[in-house]
Amino acid sequence: MSTLHVISHSPFGDNRLDSCLRLLGANDGLLLCGDAVYALQPGSTACERLTASNLGPRLFALEEDLLARAIADSPARAVDYPAFVALSLDYDKVNSWL
């Protein structure tokens, strides 16, 4: 069973991202939105952890949030809202890390 994990909180304020990365299954995806896209800042510890997690094509970020935070060079695939909806249907479950 696959799960799309959605994180919207900054990786610098709590440990949601680290907890999520520990629990990710082989078929799970991760979507970063809101302040969570700060995890994609090149050179940050959070970005290094994401890169080391080998998510590859299963790492997504809301394009609108990347643009709003001026994050241009990201290992995540940028998606718009319709693609976010499509992603949520591609996975068996969606888990929002509130």
Language model regions located:
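Short internal beta-strands
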Residues: 28-35, 57-63
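Short, charged/polar "capping" segments at the starts of alpha-helices
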Residues: 37-41, 67-70
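A glycine-rich helix N-cap at a beta->alpha junction
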Residues: 46-70
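Histidine-anchored nucleotide/phosphate-binding helix
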Residues: 12-27
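Short, glycine-rich nucleotide/cofactor-binding loops
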Residues: 3-16, 36-40
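C-terminal structural segments of small proteins and small subunits
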Residues: 69-98
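Charged helix-capping and loop-helix junction motifs
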Residues: 43-48, 77-80
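Structural motif
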Residues: 7-10, 34, 63-64, 98
